[in-house]
């Protein structure tokens, strides 16, 4: 599989692993069809390991930064068009909605589905600092200013992933029944 999507909107703003001609185990951010970083085998994620991954995009300063386990991995300046990103836009059709673990096509099309597991996803409308990302890799107060959505994926029932911020951005699983993880132990790398 060439692309393994973490989250985003196809052809608009995606955080993913791999791409055509790009290493399958390297993180890539693609916004308005501008992709970063360049292919680099020194940045590959190892199969079978848990990672905390994050990307920040300051649209005003046109700077995007990618973090792995709370540490800066890649940075690009003069990135993007300087326009805000709207992950809530739904006027492009169902194939182009914000998705987690999948980016395009029908739920039964596994060609761009994440080949892995996700413990939590957070979406912010502020640029988090490296220190904030590192300190809050494993937990954050759901009422923190700028936190728009926070899915823990630990509900264990139905097909709804609750948004813990209280903003009502509940996510719906496209597999039925949803598979909820149990007993996952994730090493807290910021506490080692």
Give names to the regions the model predicted.
Residues 1-169, 175-192:
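Extracellular glycan-associated modules
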